[in-house]
UniProtKB/Swiss-Prot annotation:
Residues 16-25 have a biased composition (Basic and acidic residues). Residues 1-32 are annotated as: Disordered. GO terms for biological process: translation. GO terms for cellular component: ribonucleoprotein complex; ribosome. This is Small ribosomal subunit protein uS8. Belongs to the universal ribosomal protein uS8 family. Part of the 30S ribosomal subunit. Contacts proteins S5 and S12. The gene is rpsH. It comes from Synechococcus sp. (strain CC9311). Coiled coil: none annotated. Keywords: Ribonucleoprotein, Ribosomal protein, RNA-binding, rRNA-binding. PANTHER family: 40S RIBOSOMAL PROTEIN S15A (PTHR11758). The keyword DNA damage does not apply. Pfam families: Ribosomal_S8 (PF00410).
Amino acid sequence: MANHDPISDMLTRIRNASEKRHESTKVPASRMSRSIAKVLQQEGFIAEISEQGEGVRTELVLGLKYSGKHRQPTIRSMQRVSKPGLRIYKNTRGLPKVLGGLGVAIISTSKGVMSDRDARKQGVGGEVLCYVY
């Protein structure tokens, strides 16, 4: 079956694995999924990124992070914002602050995929892919 929204699929896989306290999860590799994973790692939501497989079947293995003795997931919520049927674009001034700055909005800009903080620093807007907190 064809996957019509690979970003939503990636976010759902991470969310489900995190709720079940898995050590890692696999997502199909693409340039966009690599970029999103890199932003999540830079912001401290995932521990590590590695690749497994070859060619079309390449997958990203994302190591998930937990905190405290009860292993609470670092990722509490992931919400897809811009969807294939309704794209959401924001300029620099319109970029959202997730949870008053405690969360991260992942933005696809002309300079690549980055967090909302980086987009504000560079003075660029773009498509708001998702919120993570």
